[in-house]
Amino acid sequence: MIRAYESKDLPLMIAIWNEVVEEGIAFPQEEALSEETGKAFFEEQTYCGVAEVDGKVVGLYILHPNNVGRCGHICNASYAVSSSCRGLHIGEKLVLDCLEQAAKHGFRVLQFNAVVESNLHARHLYERLGFVQLGTIPGGFRMKDGHYENICPYYHEV
């Protein structure tokens, strides 16, 4: 089940987010969220959805504008699924809910700025759901081990 986050979800949301940050292969952030910074980070999003399995938060997404003004109708999102629950199609449910929420919040396009080229599971999911790759940015992502990988921006009309 996907639903809007509540303050009681913050500890698990922060833990899941930090797990992806620590892996260093998908999110651009390098610093883990603390209880305080995590609360502020999630509160400032346009929308945050969480995935629950058996009453426990196992995944989440954040949704926010990708730009301002005349480009403010384009949004951006990030997804995180607990490593113990990957491969269960939770990411797909999060993306589909995100597209619905983007429309409800008045966005017209969902754009992913920095999908790492080697993140094949995410790329195949996005393409299966109708996202279009905009090109490739050579060496656009610095992996945790220090080497650079290409990133692939994607978009989907909402």
Labelled PLM ranges:
Residues S7, A26-S84, V95-L96, Q101, ...:
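Acetyl-CoA-dependent GNAT
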Residues R86, F112-A122, G140-D145:
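Conserved beta-strand-loop-alpha-helix junction that forms the acyl-donor binding cleft
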Residues Y126, F131, Y154:
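Conserved active-site tyrosine of GNAT-family acetyltransferases
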Residues Y79, I137, K144-V158:
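Terminal substrate-recognition subdomain of acyl/acetyltransferases
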Residues A102-V115:
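Conserved GNAT acetyl-CoA-binding A-motif
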Residues M1-M13:
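A short beta-loop-alpha structural element at the N-terminal edge
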Residues A15-E31:
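Helix-loop element at the rim of GNAT/NAT acetyltransferase active sites that forms part
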